[in-house]
A protein has these predicted regions:
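Hydrophobic stripe of amphipathic alpha-helices that form coiled-coil interfaces
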Residues: 100, 107, 114, 176, ...
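Heptad-repeat amphipathic alpha-helical coiled-coil interaction surface used
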Residues: 97-99, 104, 122, 166, ...
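Membrane-embedded beta-strand positions in outer-membrane beta-barrel channels/transporters
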Residues: 80, 147-151, 195, 300, ...
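Outer-membrane beta-barrel proteins
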Residues: 127-131, 233, 346-350
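Terminal intrinsically disordered/low-complexity segments used for targeting and assembly
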Residues: 2-85, 131-135, 146, 170, ...
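Short flexible linkers and secondary-structure junctions
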Residues: 19-190, 334-339, 355-359, 368-378
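Periplasmic alpha-helical coiled-coil/stalk elements that build and connect Gram-negative outer-membrane
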Residues: 162, 178-299, 409, 413, ...
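Sec/SRP-type N-terminal targeting helices
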Residues: 91-92, 156-184, 234, 238, ...
Length: 491
């Protein structure tokens, strides 16, 4: 009997190295060499003035981790660092990662090691000897049975059900780690985008107010001319309409600025009413945000290893693969070994006198008929893997699209800024000439103000175009996955 038990146990130990189900392999990266059909331009168009330099795209193995420092603004760096430290979104992601790690630690201990428990109990019993056919001996009085023992049990993972389940839990740890990296990337990107938008809105409000002032002066002149019979009433009404329309653009701009401040406050982990970061916000202008001249650009084949959201989707695919292994292993036998040793006495003071009971048990369970449950669960796990793979492919395709969109946007933004800058310079030159001619009586005050109004309008358009280049550069960095990725959990 002992030799048979040893044979069974030895066989179980040998089989414990067998793991059924698919072994996970990361999907192949995208095969395309470029992000768009037209390819990446050698350089974008250039314009004179702030933010007008040409951008070149430099092939690189990865994107700088702290990519926001490429904008050369100490105030922006402080805001991003503060958000990465205090954002509630990141606090939640960190807590979820800790939760996943502790769940893995708990499952690993239960799956890899025997469970050992100590037991101490007292049971009040009474024996009826007559029920055993013993009638000549009187029944003993009731007594208390004291038990102190240690029990050990272990499930031999013959076909890898526990190992696959542990693999799935470890993949969940990877998922939460990449989700944290993705959240960091999103928070940093949102701070940069909001900072650019805030700087642009402040500049737009300033220029628009100057436009209102210029149009108001024009209206005063036209009303004086109307009184003198120099212009028609319809011309004055047209000027009043233009002034009202320009004034009407100020409240929405002020609302957008306030909402941007509120968004930044939440990203920084403070209430919208807080003025904690006002010095940094006041230091942000479009001219202090420098456009990166050289932008690191990774290959599409590297994108799948650089983007945290793609790595998170890969971790979920890994988890689905491991769950197929769990469902497959559940179709096979399971062996359990258990034993205990201890003492059982009728007087509690005798419990320490020595060991007098032990047991050793062996169990084998082979599923035979479960109404199709186990096979259905295996098919369900395989379908879940198919869904996870489709989600992974969709994530990769969306990432490629985001990079392609950002590249095309930057190319168009540069061309737009070039045109807007040329228009602004020409309008400013006209205003300068008009001012000189006005000084010698060559043009009227109305004409001078009109050329100044045109210069302000073109400056407003240039401001928007300059902000678009900064915002889309940040979008490209974010699309390329500029974030510190965690090392894959060792297996």
């Amino acid at each position: 009997m002992n030799s048979r038990a040893l044979l069974i146990i030895s066989t179980a130990l040998v089989l414990a190295g067998c793991t059924v189900g698919p072994d996970f392999h990361a999907p192949a990266p995208p095969e395309s060499a470029t992000y768009t059909r037209e390819g990446t331009p050698a350089a974008t168009a250039a314009a004179q003035g702030a933010g007008g330099g040409a951008q070149i795209f430099v092939a690189a193995p990865n994107v700088p981790n702290a990519w926001w420092t490429q904008f050369g603004s100490a105030a922006l760096d402080e805001l991003v660092d503060a958000a990465l430290t205090a954002s509630p979104t990141l606090d939640s992601a960190r807590a979820k990662l800790i939760e996943a790690r502790e769940n893995y630690n708990a499952q690993a201990g239960a799956a890899l090691f025997p469970s050992v428990d100590a037991k101490l109990s007292a049971t009040r019993e009474k024996i009826d000897l007559a029920s055993f056919g013993i009638t000549a001996v009187p029944n003993p009085p009731p007594f208390t049975l004291y038990n102190a023992s240690i029990s050990v049990s272990y499930v031999f993972d013959l076909f890898g059900a526990n190992r696959r389940a542990l693999e799935a839990t470890l993949a969940q740890v990877d998922y939460e780690a990449y989700e944290l990296a993705a959240a960091r990337l999103t928070v940093a990107g949102n701070v940069v985008s909001a900072a650019v938008r805030r700087a642009s809105l402040r500049e737009q409000i300033t220029i628009t107010q100057q436009l209102v002032d210029a149009q108001s002066r024009q209206l005063v002149i036209m009303e004086a001319r109307l009184a003198a019979g120099g212009v028609a009433d319809i011309d004055v009404r047209s000027q009043r309409t233009l002034l009202a329309q320009t004034r009407a653009t100020l409240p929405p701009l002020a609302t957008q600025l306030a909402q941007t401040d509120h968004q930044l406050a939440v990203l920084l982990g403070v209430p919208p009413s807080s003025a904690q970061f006002q010095p940094q916000l006041d230091g942000l202008t479009l001219d202090t945000l420098h456009l990166p001249g050289a932008v690191a650009l990774t290959l599409p084949s590297s994108l799948a290893r650089e983007r945290p959201d793609i790595r998170a989707a890969e971790a979920l695919l890994h988890q689905a693969s491991a769950n197929v292994g769990v469902a497959t292993a559940n179709l096979y036998p399971q062996i359990t070994l258990s034993g205990s040793i201890g003492t059982e006495r009728t007087h509690i003071e005798d419990v320490v006198d020595g060991l007098n009971i032990w047991n050793l048990g062996f169990g084998l369970t082979q599923p035979i008929f479960h109404g199709g449950e186990l096979h259905a669960k295996k098919r369900a796990a395989e379908a879940a893997w198919d869904a996870a793979f489709a989600d992974y492919r969709q994530t990769v395709l969306q990432a490629l699209q985001q990079v392609a969109d950002a590249l095309r946007a930057l190319e168009s933004d540069a061309q737009a800024l070039q045109s807007r800058d040329e228009a602004a310079r020409e309008a400013q030159a006209s205003a300068t000439v008009a001012l000189a001619r006005y000084g010698v009586g060559g043009v009227s005050e109305f004409s001078l103000i009109d050329t100044q109004r045109q210069a302000l309008q073109t400056a407003l358009d240039r401001t928007r175009a300059q902000a678009d280049r900064l915002a889309d550069t940040a979008a490209l960095y974010q699309a390329l996955g500029g974030a510190t990725l965690p090392a894959e959990t060792a297996r």
